[in-house]
Swiss-Prot record:
Taxonomic lineage from the root: Bacteria, Pseudomonadati, Thermodesulfobacteriota, Desulfuromonadia, Desulfuromonadales
Function of the molecule: This protein is one of the early assembly proteins of the 50S ribosomal subunit, although it is not seen to bind rRNA by itself. It is important during the early stages of 50S assembly.
NCBIfam families to which the protein is assigned, alphabetical: rplM_bact
Keyword Ribosomal protein: yes
Record-linked InterPro entries: Ribosomal_uL13, Ribosomal_uL13_bac-type, Ribosomal_uL13_CS, Ribosomal_uL13_sf
Gene (name only): rplM
Keywords: Ribonucleoprotein, Ribosomal protein
GO cellular component, one term: cytosolic large ribosomal subunit
Quaternary organization: Part of the 50S ribosomal subunit.
The protein, known as: Large ribosomal subunit protein uL13
Length: 142
């Protein structure tokens, strides 16, 4: 008997709802990355995107341990000389809390073409409401 390889047309995708309130960023991001990859499914295949959709609410209430709010920095570059931008995790949490979770999850996904497709299945909202009620997401307690 041969091992069955997952095909993209046979993958059934579920929607999960995660409440990020008072959850630690790194622990939450690693569990979300596993769901986006599909590692929680029996049909997981590394070369096929078998993951599910994840909706994260209350991103503004996420917790960081230690002094990471002040000490952890995120960098971006415009491509021009002297165009290096730096922002601390605390300021990023105030301005764009969705970006903080997105960057953490992106760093835990594989660095290949599939990671862009996996990241598109992640929906993050700062508040407690989301527009995905029609998909009937299952509440996931992490």
């Amino acid at each position: 008997m041969k091992t069955e390889v997952a095909k993209i047309e046979n993958v059934k995708r579920d929607w999960y709802l995660v409440d990020a309130q008072e959850m630690v960023l790194g622990r939450l991001a690693s569990q979300i990355a596993n769901i986006l990859r599909g590692k929680n499914k029996a049909i997981y295949t590394p070369s096929v995107d078998t993951g599910d959709f994840v909706i994260v609410v209350n991103a503004e209430k996420i917790a960081l341990t230690g002094r990471k709010l002040a000490d952890k920095s995120y960098y971006s570059h415009s491509g021009f000389p002297g165009g290096l931008k730096e922002i601390s995790a605390g300021k990023l949490l105030e301005k764009k809390p969705e970006e903080l979770i997105k960057r953490a999850v992106k760093g835990m996904l594989p660095k290949n073409k599939l990671s862009r497709h996996m990241l598109k299945k992640l929906k993050i909202y700062a508040g407690s409401s989301h527009p995905h009620d029609a998909q009937q997401p299952k509440v996931l307690a992490l």
